[in-house]
A protein has these predicted regions:
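Mg2+/Mn2+-dependent nuclease catalytic core
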Residues: 57-154
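Conserved pre-motif I regulatory segment
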Residues: 173-220
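Conserved RecA-like P-loop NTPase helicase motor core
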Residues: 619-630, 681-793
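Signature of the SF2 helicase/ATPase Hel1-core->accessory helical subdomain module
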Residues: 231, 237, 258, 339-358, ...
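A substrate-engagement module of RecA-like helicase motors
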Residues: 178, 185, 243-359, 367, ...
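A contiguous, basic/glycine-rich beta-loop/short-helix subdomain that forms a polymer-engagement track
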Residues: 334-359, 369-376, 505-622, 630-632, ...
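Conserved helicase motor "Helicase C" RecA-like lobe of SF1/SF2 P-loop NTPases
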Residues: 655-680
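Metal-dependent nuclease catalytic cores that hydrolyze phosphodiester bonds in DNA/RNA
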Residues: 1-78, 108
């Protein structure tokens, strides 16, 4: 029987944790601040103190061999020559309330480390010391207990005997899973064209010899070939051969998680003996069963019955779920179990993930530095990563590592706090003053168009360039200064220092006045401050600082321009990663921005008959900003020609809502007989579903939808058959010119001379190709893609077209388009 690998912390917390979920303010960032304090205490101990000592030992309980491992915070020998295991804990509990028996898990961890180290070193006795560091007062309290090795071994053995039934369940499951997955057959009678090739690439990546940073694979495969099954099936087969312990299926949006769930359901339906557990992790806000009056989760034992006593009941819930035989733990299943056992569905999903084989969730569970799954990714593991819609990852990753803070947050906090003097009020005023001076400095360096620095300043004082009234705050040298926006390569320390100084009094106030009316507003401020300070600690040459003055406000953004080192570090936590999409062109761009320059990249050709796709371009139309007004009527005429060629459903994609509205107003005025539907901004899930429902099969009347490229209908939408028979794409999708995009352009110009491509052309064309991919979804589909912009005829754009677009026809005018469409539908 293979040994059961068991981390010390997992063993102790699983068996001994009790009580409730309590997310009330605790005054510090446990993960980051706690680690910093650990290092501080370890350094202060002097010579002879070994920090972060890895320990591992073999034990047996109930016939099960265990490998127990973990890192002891510290080990040293005291003046009496006794070996001491030091367990360090940071806490917000007041020093007077810190008790020796405050948390049994803390002693248990130290005692297990003592058992491992004692046997390893042949010791007869040793001490366990609990070191508590009170984060508000810097008080250090220490408690010491004396043990014989025999006592520690007995304690560890008792824990293992309690854990043995769970280990036995999991070992039996893994054996059953291995047999099942190694014999797993493809769930369809035959592979679609392209599926076998894609599956083979993924299987080879997952079964390749492990490397320090993991194997990386980029797969571009046409829309409609069945990418989800083509990557899931080989990855599961790899787990069946012993290559990979868990599979993480990571998505850009909740709507694509269902594709993974459906693929796994198909595998289960095709093999009744399939042993596979899958869990879908959904954001807490969406699954909360007991939100507060404002609709937010209230994770406090006195407010939420699902939080109260959670740890006393969760193991019972886990046992029931693991024994029920279904193995499918989606959002609905977790909600049902949460109600049955009165446990939080969000936390239940996280705890259940440790017992599941496939974990489906958002990108942020791996890549986000704040919310990633620490239980899996704080150290490397035998994990397989499947990254869906990977073309979305560069922008999502940039957002995850960036942060913003506004002066208005300080103003609102001061207003909420009310009148009176306090340490917090003083700190708020200092920070507010620094941001006020920062706004003056930005307005001086970069007056908004049509204004002066004086008009930007609402303080009642004049601060024109060259005047005697100079801003009292110094900003780093500006790389860009225009229209109220300044970019700097260096951190604006003069703004960050008062925010850092604000942290302690803000923590104190939040802890001392939890019931104050202003608590919610100041708690929001605290998290905003922490977010920008965390980003400042990551800040290096891959970032830029943006300061924007608008009216009385100043916004500070620390922008991650290049997320490659951070994505690389995240992917290195696993054995292998396959990043796939219908649009990863050019591959070198995606490999560079995602930190995988040496990764293998494959591009599969479309399996669909070229004659089923009518592909036309009207290069006589220019959609450049200066020609927008002149383009409206020709675009309307082209859309009318498309929508009138055959009764059916069509989509027209635009680069912006404003442009969309202009054309829609002209179109509906001139072609009122053609039904239209407009994508509104900010649609929720219900609005999205309602929009798509209008695209019904076998329509009796033509419907032309107006949508935005790169939005919720421009990708990730499956309208097969005659639910969609044509789309028009207006423009080449370039992001709007902005200071941020210009900084991206400058950054990559300096890196490789391709700044315009990285900041504008390639992201824009990705949106174009994604939108075009909505039309042909199956072998039987037939439809039209119409490109409206003269730049599609330029080689810099045309070379980005996929191979199956080789039959694209450039037409003179709308009349020729009408004739071509008539011929296409007649075939």
């Amino acid at each position: 029987m293979p040994a059961f690998r068991l981390p010390v912390r997992q063993l102790v917390e699983f068996l001994l944790r009790t009580g409730s979920i309590d997310s009330r303010f605790t005054g510090f960032d446990r993960a980051n601040e706690g680690a910093r304090i650990h290092r501080k205490l370890q350094k202060a101990t002097g010579e002879g103190y070994a920090a972060e000592v890895f320990l591992s030992g073999e034990r047996e309980a109930a016939g099960i061999p265990f490998t127990i491992e973990g890192r002891a915070d510290g080990i040293f020998t005291d003046e009496a020559g006794v070996t001491v295991i030091d367990e360090i804990k940071t806490t917000a509990v007041p020093a007077d309330d810190i008790a020796e028996d405050m948390n049994p898990c803390h002693w248990a961890q130290g005692m297990v480390y003592g058992a491992l180290y004692g046997r390893q070193q042949g010791l007869e006795k040793l001490d366990v010391r609990l070191t508590y560091y009170q984060i508000d007062t810097d008080d250090i309290l220490r408690f010491v207990r004396h043990f014989t090795l025999e006592e520690l071994e007995a304690f560890l053995q008792d824990l293992l005997e309690q854990y043995a039934p769970w280990a036995q369940r999991q070992l039996a499951w893994k054996e059953q899973r291995g047999v099942s997955l190694s014999a797993l057959d493809f769930p369809f009678p035959a592979y679609r064209p392209g599926q076998r090739a894609l599956a083979g690439e993924v299987y080879r990546a997952c079964t390749a010899a492990p490397s320090k940073s993991g194997v990386r694979l980029f797969c571009q495969a046409p829309t409609g070939i069945g990418k989800t099954m083509s990557v899931l099936f080989p990855a599961l087969r790899a787990i069946g051969t012993g290559c990979g312990e868990k599979l993480f299926y990571l998505t850009a949006r909740n709507t694509t998680q269902s594709a993974a769930e459906d693929a796994i359901a198909r595998l289960r339906a095709s093999d009744s003996k399939l042993a596979l557990r899958s869990v879908t992790l959904t954001a807490k806000e969406k699954v909360c069963l007991h939100p507060d009056a404002e609709g937010h989760p209230a994770c406090l034992p006195e407010l939420c019955p699902y939080a109260n006593g959670y740890y006393d009941r969760v193991n019972t819930a886990l046992k029931a779920l693991l024994d029920d035989g279904t193995g499918r733990f989606d959002r609905a299943a977790l909600a049902d179990a949460a109600k049955q056992f009165t446990v939080c569905p969000f936390e239940l999903g996280l705890d259940l993930s440790e017992w599941c084989d496939v974990i489906i969730g958002d990108y942020n569970y791996l890549f986000d530095p704040v919310v990633h799954l620490r239980r899996f990714f704080d150290s490397a593991g035998d994990w397989l990563f499947l990254v869906d819609e990977a073309h979305n990852l560069p922008e999502r990753a940039r957002a995850m590592y960036s942060a913003r803070f506004c002066k208005s947050s300080l103003t609102e906090a001061k207003r909420a706090l009310g009148r009176g003097k306090s340490t917090l009020k003083t700190a708020l005023s200092k920070a507010d003053k620094a941001f006020l001076e920062g706004r003056k400095a930005v307005s001086t360096l970069a007056p908004r168009r049509g204004s002066t620095a004086a008009e930007e300043d609402d303080s009642g004082q004049t601060s024109l360039p060259g005047s005697a009234e100079t801003p009292a705050i110094g900003l780093p040298a500006a790389d860009y200064a225009q229209d109220g926006t300044v970019f700097c390569k260096e951190l604006p320390s003069a703004l960050l220092a008062p925010l850092r100084a604000l942290t302690a009094p803000l923590q104190d106030w939040l802890e001392e006045d939890p019931d104050a009316e202003a608590h919610a507003a100041l708690l929001d401020l605290y998290f905003e401050v922490q977010d920008i300070l965390r980003a400042s600690e990551r800040y290096d040459e891959h970032f830029a600082a943006q300061l924007t003055a608008r009216g009385s406000d100043l916004e500070l953004q620390l922008l991650c321009l290049d997320p490659s080192p951070f994505v690389d570090a995240s992917l290195s936590a696993g054995r292998a990663a396959a990043l796939f999409s219908a649009t990863l062109t050019p591959p070198g761009y995606y490999r560079t921005v995602l930190g995988c320059p040496e990764a293998r990249a494959v591009a599969l050709e479309s399996p669909f008959p070229a004659e089923n796709l009518g592909l036309y371009c009207l290069p006589s139309i220019s959609t450049r900003y200066r020609q927008r007004d002149a383009s409206i009527r020709p675009i309307s005429d082209a859309l009318a020609a498309l929508a009138s060629s055959r009764v059916g459903n069509y989509l027209a994609f635009f680069p912006s809502y404003a442009y969309l509205r202009q054309v829609w107003e002209d179109f509906t005025a001139r072609y009122p007989d053609i039904g239209t539907l407009v994508q509104e901004s900010g649609l929720d899930d219900a609005g999205r579903a309602a929009f798509l429902e209008r695209f019904s099969p076998c329509p009796e009347k033509t419907l032309l939808g107006f949508g935005v490229m790169g939005g919720i209908f421009g990708e990730g939408v499956d309208l097969a058959g005659d639910r969609l028979i044509g789309c028009a794409i207006v423009g080449v999708g370039l992001p709007q010119v902005s200071p941020r995009q210009e900084m991206l352009r400058r950054y990559y110009d300096a890196q490789n001379g391709a700044g315009f491509d990285y900041a504008y052309r390639w992201p824009g064309m990705n949106k174009v190709l994604q939108a075009a991919g909505r039309v042909i979804r199956t072998q039987e589909d037939k439809g039209v893609v119409l490109l409206l912009d003269d730049r599609f005829a330029q080689s810099e754009y045309a070379r980005l077209f996929p191979k199956h677009w080789s039959h694209l026809e450039y037409l003179r005018d709308t009349e020729e388009l009408k004739k071509k469409l008539e011929d296409f539908w007649a075939e």
